[in-house]
Amino acid sequence: LPGALNNSRKKITIEFDEFIKLDKPGEKIVISPPQVQQPEIKSNGKKVVITLKDTLKPDMTYSIDFADAIQDNNEGNPLPDFGFTFSTGSVIDSMAVSGTVLNAFNLEPVKGMLVGMHSNLADSAFTTLPFERVGRTDSRGRFTIRGVAPGEYRIYGLQDADQNFYYSQPTEVIAFEDSLIIPSMDQRMRFDTLWKDSLTIDTIMEKMYTHYSPDDVILRCFKELTLSQRLIKSERPEPRKFSFYFSAPADSLPLLKGLNFDETDAFIVEKPTGRIDTLQYWIRDSLVYQMDTLKMSLTYLYTDTLNQLVPRTDTLKLVSKLRPKSEKELEKEREKKEKELEKAKKKAEKEGKEYVEPTVFLPVDVYAPGTMDIYDYISLTFTEPLASVADSTIHLKQKIDSLWRDVPFDFIPDSLNLMRYNVYADWEPGESYTFEVDSTAFQGIYGLFTDKVKKEFKVKKPEEYGQIFFDVSGADSLAFVDLLDAQDKVVRTVPVVNSRADFYFLNPGKYSARLINDRNGNGVWDTGKYEDKRQPEEVYYYYQVLELKANFDLTQSWNIHDRPLDKQKPGELKKQKPDEDKKKKNQNNRNSGNRR
């Protein structure tokens, strides 16, 4: 029977009043203590049969948590939170610990994560020993660990990739609580109300129940930053470009030496700002990029077996993924082009026009929307790095009293994209502008020039925008706020200054906000590290989605500690939705199981 003592049998049969089935038993059913060998769990008619493969531990409470895995066979209605407990000794441990696991960065509930406890309070227990008691989170991120004995515990979260019940791989997502967990239970009273009708109370009944604490543990899960440095991949996607991909950012460029070509001034290197993990090399020299195979040595910093950065040199052979065309294919292309040219000339003669061979231009994508935001700017993105820029051929004009007049602007290379340039100007609200670039203003490294460009646009007026101002309390001295759209994507970021986070010139729409306590002041969210007992930087959500209208200001008071973390993120922003509510079984079914 449930709660049996001195049990020695490894095969357990639970019988129900009607035919049942199991839904995803491998995912939903959790057994404590965790089993090294996977148990066999089957449904058969009105029965569930569990066969444990591990040797039973003496004087141990075993709990089998079915979550909502048991369903009636006809309609699939779940039996919620069904559990089964027995002991191999003379005492059964009956306390429980509950809580919620959230993604530390965006406070999303985390489904299917293992949560475990250790009575061994050493930090090394999490990285060397299997959990003693375990639970698993549901679609709301909620977990319950049952069959807990009195005492002090450490609690952890783990996405257990290798199913060994401890943290053994740096790629595993983890969580840990700084404070000790001390389970307890007490008797409490609740009141159930019986109604005569929708307006009249019949009876208020008092019911005693057992309350288990703590039931509000919050675990913020994260993945540690992988600092192991190695070359993941090298490739040459086209003859004129090759790339290197590293597993972690570095502070300096690797040293490249050509073995069948001269590398001196042979490349333009496209790299992100700051620390480097992805490098694109554009080959300048046509004699080099026409080679089928590029042989080179690459010296870079590599993490050795002692976790130290040491120089390492790899010899590489890079072959273009695009197959070079054969002489026969090139000859066919030339013949086809000559035929098309002759056809175009004859057509021009027939129409009495002079034939002009079309010019091939360097492609450029110009971002200059017809309606320009006050804070926005023009950008030009090219398909290859530029060899030259003629600044004098770029013109920005404002329409003043029906005349187009030149206005000052800054033309600046983009800090993140080698092939993008930005045009900044102090826009006059509500005014019209034209942006023009003469032909041949830009030349790519492979010789092509750009065509002329002309874009006209009008700048929005201030009354087309709204503003949101947050009065923030409870934040650290270094904090910033991300303004979010309805899809939880960052629209804009501002620092918290004098307990204020102000957002100006916002387009009408729905917004929410996320605050990050930026402990190291680097302007980005940083993950945690278990070895250093460093939690990820704290994230808090404003609890509402705000609807902003044009020409309207919203001022919101925001105490980041007003609500528990699991109650902060607005439901409409959450991507992890609770499983669809199903019709629940009669609660009497909870007690209908009999052990045989």
Question: Across the structure, where does each feature detected by a protein language model lie?
Answer:
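N-terminal targeting or signal-anchor segments and their processing/structural boundaries
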Residues: 1-596
